């Protein structure tokens, strides 16, 4: 656990320094080589605005509930360090059981059978009010640290602007 916290602290410090040490781009430049001073050339086009997401729902599947619980703690702690609003974290009480019945001998003795059972445990986590860059960084970080035997499925809900034709009420005839 201490190892995870150490890596998490280093990761959050790296993100904070990356935010503030990116080079500034000039909005316009002055061209003085042609003899005429004051010619302004336009700068590079402005970057696209970051997408906004209202909710990120993560579903974890695994065979060991203790590993799922530990990984949930790890992911929520990482979200707190990145400033992501944590929602509800929960798991169903019962696991999903899958049973297979096979014959002990392939050719004879139908009375002698063996049963195998696989139990799949689920865990759900919700996070709210994310930007696109924060969401990508967070998902990449938790996917890289996903333990063996655990499957992760993420579904995101994007916020979009209301179309122009729906903003104005219809005119009365």
From Swiss-Prot:
Keywords (A to Z) from UniProt? Mitochondrion, Ribonucleoprotein, Ribosomal protein
Q: Subcellular localization, per the record?
A: Mitochondrion
Q: Which GO terms describe its biological process?
A: mitochondrial translation
What is the predominant subcellular site recorded for this chain? Answer: mitochondrion
The Swiss-Prot or TrEMBL record annotates one GO molecular function as: structural constituent of ribosome
Q: Name one Pfam family in it.
A: Ribosomal_S10
Q: Which GO terms describe its cellular component?
A: mitochondrial small ribosomal subunit; mitochondrion
SUPFAM superfamilies attached to this UniProt entry: Ribosomal protein S10 (SSF54999)
- Has keyword Mitochondrion? yes
Q: Which InterPro entries match?
A: Ribosomal_uS10_dom (IPR027486), Ribosomal_uS10_dom_sf (IPR036838), Ribosomal_uS10m (IPR040055)
Please name the SMART domains in this protein's record.
Ribosomal_S10
Could you name the domain of life of the organism this protein comes from?
A: Eukaryota
Assembly and partners?
Component of the mitochondrial ribosome small subunit (28S) which comprises a 12S rRNA and about 30 distinct proteins.
The family classification in the record reads: Belongs to the universal ribosomal protein uS10 family.
Name of the protein this chain belongs to: Small ribosomal subunit protein uS10m
